Amino acid sequence: MDGGAGSMWEQVFADLAPGFVPDDGALDRAAADLGFPLPASYRAFCRTCGVGLAGGQFRIAVPAPFEACDLVTQAGLIAHSVGAAVAMLEEGAEPHRFDVEGGEASVVERACFFGAGEDGSFLFWDVSGTDGEYDVWLLAPDLETVRFGGESLDDFFTRVAAPSAALVLGPGAEPLPARFEGIAEATLARTEQAQP
């Protein structure tokens, strides 16, 4: 484990039990498949935390040989699912529109989805960043509300585990626990084998 990356995530998650951790080769292949460099905070997350449940709420996709948690697979699946749901919403009486915090709707056009919340929300990067990081955004379960989550993945989890959680997760939301519960490779393999 990289001392700097590990200590960063150990500060974010006071209770950290790592799951399956991808190697650098898997991270590089995922970046090549997606067509952009993976943010430094995300790479550190993958190498320190791996597959699991963050804050009791979010599953962050990581490069893995298991479709249910693989970054490239999930990025495409979530984008397709959100697109299909938005298309259904557009068939209603009023046209669908994203209500983006700050008013810059173009962040949705540059979205790469990389995480899902237990409440039906989705996390995505605005891949226009140039400093080695991408802003993290949250698409609420209503598939309309888009809130700024943080300037990096560690910033996002720091914000949602603090009183500022309601600014990201929505009015009335309580701070999430500073906990990461990893899922072991053996468990992921059994789950993959059990699927039809």
Question: Model-derived features: where do they sit?
Answer:
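A generic structural signal for short, non-catalytic loop/turn and secondary-structure boundary residues
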Residues: 106-107, 129-131
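Short acidic/polar mixed-charge low-complexity motifs
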Residues: 119-121, 144
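A surface-exposed partner-binding patch
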Residues: 1-119, 187-196
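Acidic, proline/glycine-rich low-complexity IDRs
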Residues: 165-196
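Short, surface-exposed beta-strand/loop micro-motifs that present aromatic residues
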Residues: 121-128
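Intrinsically disordered, low-complexity regulatory segments enriched in Ser/Thr/Pro
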Residues: 132-141
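Compact, glycine/acidic-enriched structural inserts
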Residues: 146-167
